[in-house]
């Protein structure tokens, strides 16, 4: 079954995995078995050495836990890039427009690893440019939502609405937990404070992140993202 999938289903020529990689029923398959399978079908296999961060082994489980805890600096260090997603911009309830902070809304698909609910400093890629974003991940308790989503204000973007476009967004740093405000005026004041914090974090990241984290990031992530109808952003 595994051989058929690798050879005919995926047409795999090269496979890379971690030293402790296990797969199959009851995790019976290991790197030695996979190596023999690749050799038997003319493929190549590369075992990636274990990587440590802060004295502990980096693993998918550890990265997911850090995402769920909102530890984005650690996530960036372990992934070698910021955690992000690329989803379509959908219509919301337009509260942001009402209070002068228009936002883009992006829904999370089923089984997506949800970050800790709250506000983040983010990077948003639009038409080859990188913008500072103030992103709320959660259910918007002040105005109410029946599902978790990403809602981002892009203070410096003045290019009109982005509905229907598929945009890349990266979460750089956690700012605060999600909370309910007594009214929209209080929410507006808080968003202004969050924007100042997010901008400081965004500028620090752009300046300090090593080149391998975001080489030509605006070109690599912000261009050639498709719309739903197949045209390019």
Role assignments for model-derived ranges:
Residues 92-233:
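Phosphate/ribose-recognition catalytic cores of enzymes acting on nucleotide-derived substrates
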Residues 1-102, 125, 182-188, 192-195, ...:
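Classical nucleotidyltransferase
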């Amino acid at each position: 079954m595994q051989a058929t999938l690798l050879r005919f289903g995926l047409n795999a020529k090269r496979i890379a995995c971690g030293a402790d990689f296990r797969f199959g029923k009851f995790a019976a398959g290991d790197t030695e078995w996979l190596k023999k399978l690749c050799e038997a079908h003319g493929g190549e296999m590369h075992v990636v050495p274990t990587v440590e961060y802060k004295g502990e082994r980096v693993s998918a489980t550890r990265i997911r836990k850090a995402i769920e805890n909102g530890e984005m600096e650690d996530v960036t260090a372990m992934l070698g890039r910021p955690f992000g997603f690329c989803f379509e911009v959908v219509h919301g309830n337009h509260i942001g427009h009402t209070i002068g902070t228009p936002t883009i809304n992006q829904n999370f698909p089923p089984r997506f690893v949800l970050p800790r609910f709250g506000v983040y400093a983010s990077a948003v890629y639009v038409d080859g440019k990188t913008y500072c974003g103030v992103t709320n991940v959660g259910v918007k308790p002040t105005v109410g939502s029946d599902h978790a989503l990403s809602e981002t204000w892009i203070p410096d973007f003045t290019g009109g609405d982005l509905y229907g476009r598929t945009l890349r967004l990266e979460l750089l740093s956690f700012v605060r937990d999600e909370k309910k405000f007594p009214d929209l005026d209080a929410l507006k004041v808080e968003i202004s404070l969050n924007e100042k914090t997010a901008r400081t974090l965004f500028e620090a990241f752009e300046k300090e992140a090593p080149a391998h984290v975001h080489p030509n990031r605006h070109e690599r992530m912000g261009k050639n993202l498709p719309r739903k109808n197949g045209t390019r952003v």
